[in-house]
Amino acid sequence: METTNFGFVASLLFVGVPTIFLIGLFISTQDGEKSSFYSDSSKGRLGPKR
């Protein structure tokens, strides 16, 4: 069943990639808030554009 396997892989990628991105974004913001756009959007005193 190649079609079922392809559908499983496609759904797994469709769910897994945004999940991994959100987990990485959450870890990067928790770790000293190194994420520039998240810090700039939440509190505007940190200006990465000097």
Curated annotation (Swiss-Prot):
Protein location: Cellular thylakoid membrane
Superkingdom of the organism of origin: Bacteria
Transmembrane parts of this sequence: 7-27
Pfam families assigned: PsbM
UniProt keywords, alphabetically: Membrane, Photosynthesis, Photosystem II, Reaction center, Thylakoid, Transmembrane, Transmembrane helix
InterPro entries: PSII_PsbM, PSII_PsbM_sf
Record membrane topology: Single-pass membrane protein
One GO term describing the cellular component: photosystem II
One of the protein's GO biological processes: photosynthesis, light reaction
Purpose: One of the components of the core complex of photosystem II (PSII). PSII is a light-driven water:plastoquinone oxidoreductase that uses light energy to abstract electrons from H(2)O, generating O(2) and a proton gradient subsequently used for ATP formation. It consists of a core antenna complex that captures photons, and an electron transfer chain that converts photonic excitation into a charge separation. This subunit is found at the monomer-monomer interface.
Family membership noted in the UniProt record: Belongs to the PsbM family.
Protein name as catalogued: Photosystem II reaction center protein M
Organism the protein comes from: Prochlorococcus marinus (strain MIT 9301)
